C-alpha cells in the first residue's frame, strides 16, 4: 500500500512538472512571437502620451485589444481605467496584473522616430508631454501578457484580472485623492482578487535583469508644508521684525538632525527633504511669512510616526524660541510598497526560471514611491523591477526617470511579458 502511494505521488509530481514545462514553453514561444508587436504598441503610446485621467486614446486601444481577445471589459474605471477579465477553463484563484498608463509633463529631448508629438499647458506653463517613466512600456507589456494568457485560457486554473490604471503620477493638484490606484481600490477592483502582480521598467538596470525585494520595497510618501509666521519690518530695521526667513533657515537645519540623530538608519533608511522655500518680495523688506514645502520618505508606520512627531517638535520649538509661530501640515500620500514575504518567496523560483538565477537581483529599499502600494494594502502583492538599460549602458550615467533624456532598451520588454505571464500561471497552479 505504501509503495502504491509513493508511486502515485511520483506520478502526480511528474505529470505536474510536465504540465508546468509545457505551459512555460507555450508562454516563451508566444511572448517571443509577440515581441515586435509589443514594441510597436509601446512606440505608438510613446508618440501619443497622455497625462493622468486623460488617457482616453490609450484606454481605447487597450479596451479594443481586450475585447478582441474575448474578455469581459469594463471602461471608465477611476475615470479612464480599463479592466479586462479572463476566465480560465478550470476553477481557481483570481490573479490581478496591473499596468499604469499615464505620462508626465516633460519635454522630450531624445531624437527618436517615435518621439512624443504632444504638448500641453500644465500649471500655467507650456510643456511637452512624455512617457518619461516608462508607463508606455508597462501598457504594451501587459497587452502582450493578455494575449499570451488568452491563448492558454482553457488550461488556466482560475481567472486573470488585467488592470490598466490611470494617474499613477497623480494629477496637477497632487492631492491625496488624485492617485489612480487609490481610486480603483475605492471602486472595488480588488474585492475578488487573491493576489496582485506588477512591474516597473528601470532605465538604470540592464535589460534582461529582474530586481525584487521582500517586505518594504519602496517608500511611503508624505507631503510636508510649514508656514513660519513672524513680523514684517523694513530691512534696514531688522530689530523691529520677527524674521521668518532666519527662523525658517534654522528650522531647515534642525530638521536635518531627525534622520542623522533620531532614526536608526542601520535598520532602514528615511528621508526628510525641504524642496522649496518661498518668502519675501523685495530686497529691503523682511516678510511676514515664509512657506516651506518638502517630502518625507519612510518604510514603516513606527518610523513615520517618529518623524512626524520630531518635525512638529523641532519646527514648533524653533519658531517659538524666535517669537514666531509655525503652522505644520503633513499629508500622507502613498503607503509603503510592501511585497508580501510569503508571496515573494513562493514566486522567486518563477522569476529565476524566467530570467535565469544570475539575472534575478535583490535590490535595496527604493526611496521612490508607487501607488501600487494601495493594492497591496488590500491583498498580497509582488512588485518587481524590469531592466531597461542598454547592455553598453552605465547605471551611474544612464538617464534617469522623469527626465527629458529618459530612454529604454526595447529588448527587455519580452522578459516582462514572460515574467508576468509565468507569475500568474504559477500562482494559480500553486494555489
List where the protein language model places each region.
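Metal-dependent amide/peptide-bond hydrolase catalytic core
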Residues: 20, 68, 246-431
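Soluble non-cytosolic domains of exported or imported proteins
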Residues: 32-36, 49-60, 132, 136, ...
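Sec-dependent signal peptide recognition
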Residues: 2-9
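Hydrophobic beta-strand positions in extracellular immunoglobulin-like domains
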Residues: 86, 228-230, 296
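Acidic/His- and Gly-rich active-site-bordering loop/insert found
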Residues: 20-130, 140-157
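Divalent metal-coordination and catalytic microenvironments
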Residues: 45, 84, 97, 135, ...
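Hydrophobic h-region of N-terminal signal peptides that target proteins for export
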Residues: 10-18, 34
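Histidine/acidic-residue-rich, glycine-tolerant segments that coordinate divalent metal ions
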Residues: 119-130, 136-137, 148-267, 271-276, ...
